Amino acid sequence: MLNAAMREARQMAKRLVKQHGAKRVILFGSVARQRRLRRDSDIDLAVEGMPAENFYQIVGDLWTKQGRQVDLVRWETLRESFRQVVEREGKLLAYDGR
């Protein structure tokens, strides 16, 4: 179950960078912590540098293509205290490499 969720998260992260212009994608939450994971656990991703205009459409596309609920948050809108938690506990899945 964990391997499947991690694989899906990596696929989503790569798609966000390549197709939607994200600069960095960080996995956080239960999948990143690898505990209390259930079959229906959502995938939590913090995304930096992605344009805000199409944000909700992109979330919907990810849900449709992956078949799993995705909680996508824009890095730029997070409070500093939550950014610190994501940086400390999260896993960097993809970045644009520039």
Predicted regions and their residues:
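Catalytic core of pol beta-like nucleotidyltransferases
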Residues: M1-R24, A32-R39, E48-R98
